[in-house]
């Protein structure tokens, strides 16, 4: 639900190398840093809590409630083909922890968590050109502001 006097918080989520940071950086430049923007927050924390069998879920859920009561939140779930994620990891000389190597399983966990936890989210296919992705996101943010959510 959009609340007029609260700032918009845009949270970029998704598996490693799904394009979050690139999209965030270009979005910030194109919007002149007009929004509160985070690269990951509770969605990643909750997912990794499960994959790594941590016992912090209650803390993440409490923190999430606090964020949702303080901001108008838009979660941006960055997705791309698994083979592109593997290629990006290889090009960056990065490796996933053993428990995250089933990228499709991790992607499905992100999709489910975002769908279960947030009413206001957009899925961006980052296999497309960055300008196309940013324009789609700006359109969604503008709609959010114009339609009060």
Which residue ranges define each predicted feature?
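P-loop (Walker A) phosphate-binding loop of NTP-binding proteins
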Residues: 15
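A glycine- and Lys/Arg-enriched "phosphate-lid" helix/loop adjacent to the NTP-binding pocket
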Residues: 67-113
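Conserved glycine(s) of the Walker
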Residues: 19
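Hydrophobic anchor at the beta1->P-loop junction of P-loop NTPases
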Residues: 12
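Glycine-rich phosphate-binding loop used to anchor ATP phosphates in small-molecule kinases
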Residues: 29-82
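Hydrophobic positions on the alpha1 helix immediately C-terminal to the Walker A/P-loop
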Residues: 23
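Phosphate-binding P-loop
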Residues: 1-7
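NTP-dependent small-molecule kinase module
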Residues: 93-95, 99, 108-149
């Amino acid at each position: 639900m959009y609340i007029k006097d609260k700032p918009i918080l845009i949270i970029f989520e998704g598996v490693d190398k799904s394009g979050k940071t690139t999209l965030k950086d270009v979005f910030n430049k194109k919007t002149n840093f007009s929004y509160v923007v985070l690269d990951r927050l509770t969605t990643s924390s909750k997912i990794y809590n499960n994959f790594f069998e941590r016992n912090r879920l209650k803390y993440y859920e409490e923190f999430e409630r606090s964020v949702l009561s303080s901001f108008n939140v838009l979660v941006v779930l960055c997705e791309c083909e698994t083979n592109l994620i593997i290629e990006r990891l290889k090009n960056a000389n990065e490796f996933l922890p053993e428990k995250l190597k089933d990228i499709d399983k991790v992607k499905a966990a992100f999709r489910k968590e975002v769908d279960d936890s947030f009413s206001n989210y957009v899925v961006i296919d980052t296999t497309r050109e960055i300008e196309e992705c940013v324009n789609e996101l700006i359109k969604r943010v503008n709609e959010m502001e114009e339609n009060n959510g």
